[in-house]
Amino acid sequence: MPVRPINNLKLSAAVLLMWWGTVLSLSAAPPKVVDIKPYNDGFVEACIDGMIYWTDIDGVHLDSVNIRTVIAGIEVAEGSVLAVSPDCSVMKVERNGKTGRLCRSQIRGGSDKVTGIACSGDRTYILTENGIIYNTVDFKTFTPFDFNLTYSGYYDPARFSAICASAASIFIAGTYDNGMPAVFTSTAGNIWSERSLTYTDRAETLSLEQQPLSMAYDSRMDRFVLACTDGYLFYMPGCSHCNSLEHKALSDIAAVGFNDGRCLWTVE
């Protein structure tokens, strides 16, 4: 696969843009990119320091807004960006710079922290590291679901790092206490099933060992994709026996996004 360096592009972290047959790479200084989502004919990426960038399909920054708060994750809903902080405060951000706070902190005392936000249907789901899933339809009333408590004795406890949703499914991902990856899926956020992480390589059945750091939904291929440690992407289509693993980078992949056959990811 040919590799071409791209110069003089304004991005905020090490970024790779891929489409079938071509990989583009570039690098710049931190701050860390924590999330990437498709937006119209490009992407929107969020940095931990509060910067949000709208890009074209090639990942070139076009517009930006600084919300001046730490960002744990973003989601795009009805053309607006929903940015969630580690303490579960949510802001609505428009590309023209207009911002508004949808809710204030839902987490007190610093005992837990948010790792991501996702929308499915009319509901918004917010995931914490300890496995609390908050869901809301209006950002006024939140219903918490304690995954680790609910499934105690059935699933091993996990620490969660990513949430992603399509119109039909919600996925959460994290790591068990033994360091192995954990992925669960649900249709409504109240009943969860463990997702198989086995895949076939050279006729050998293996199981994912890398830890998930972020997750994206590839609507074109109808599959969820884990961004993992050691530079791997793990593809999870509707067929749970059709998973695949692909090595993309020399270091951990911090965030990944898909739009119309393009894949944009950042490395730590």
Give, region by region, the residue ranges found by the protein language model.
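Beta-strand-rich domains and repeat architectures in extracellular enzymes and scaffolds
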Residues: 29-50
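Recurrent small/Gly-Pro-centered beta-turn motifs in extracellular repeat architectures
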Residues: 47-48, 85, 128, 173-176, ...
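Repeated scaffold domains used in trafficking and secretory/extracellular systems
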Residues: 31-38, 69-77, 111-119, 156-164, ...
